[in-house]
């Protein structure tokens, strides 16, 4: 059991019989009283995010999760399949459990499988991935005055804003935490 005051973003806890990833933590302290810890927890089995308030001093159980290196191999419309890098065993994860992460997956993307009781319950992406631009408008000379960018659609269907000099067919590096363009690859 761990004190809720030590919760931080990215931790995994057991709460109400399910496993949750801590998405956000805000600590509020009142004068002459106990503090209030406001959290956003993502249920790893349903994908739903819920807000839970704890009083300081409460305890929660830390979930025992392990991480295994794996590669994304394919999807069949409902399940996304990954191959363990050590044992070459294949694991299927329902699309609903990786709703946010699927926009960054192309064949052979290296990920960490989040395992609980020997079963995969989610994935952890690398901090950036390289994706190809499949659709964007051509840039025009003089467009750089605004300093903005133009919309682009990547090979996975992800829509991002890229600088004007990026053209269709080029590969770009995208931050998986924010979904923003980093650089040309």
From Swiss-Prot:
One of its GO terms (biological process) is peptide biosynthetic process. Transmembrane segments: none annotated. It is found in: Cytoplasm. Pfam families: EFP, EFP_N, Elong-fact-P_C. It comes from the Bacteria. GO terms for cellular component: cytoplasm. Gene3D superfamilies: 2.30.30.30, Nucleic acid-binding proteins. NCBIfam families: efp, PRK00529.1. Belongs to the elongation factor P family. This is Elongation factor P. It comes from Thermosipho melanesiensis (strain DSM 12029 / CIP 104789 / BI429). The gene is efp.
């Amino acid at each position: 059991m761990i004190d809720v005051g030590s919760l931080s973003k990215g931790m995994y806890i057991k709460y109400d019989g399910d496993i949750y990833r801590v998405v956000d933590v805000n600590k509020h302290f009142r004068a002459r009283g106990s503090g209030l810890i406001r959290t956003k927890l993502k249920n790893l089995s349903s994908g739903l995010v819920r807000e839970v308030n704890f009083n300081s001093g409460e305890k929660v159980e830390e979930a025992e999760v392990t991480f295994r290196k794996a590669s994304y191999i394919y999807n069949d419309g409902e399940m996304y399949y990954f191959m363990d890098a050590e044992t070459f065993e294949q694991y299927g994860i329902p699309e609903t459990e990786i709703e946010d992460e699927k926009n960054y997956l192309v064949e052979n993307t290296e990920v960490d499988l989040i395992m609980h009781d020997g079963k995969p319950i989610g994935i952890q992406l690398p901090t950036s991935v390289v994706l190809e631009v499949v659709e964007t408008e051509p840039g025009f000379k003089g467009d750089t005055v605004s300093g903005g960018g133009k919309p682009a659609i990547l090979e996975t269907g992800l829509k991002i804003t890229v600088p004007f000099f990026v053209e269709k067919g080029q590969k770009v590096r995208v931050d998986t935490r924010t979904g923003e363009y980093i650089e040309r690859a």
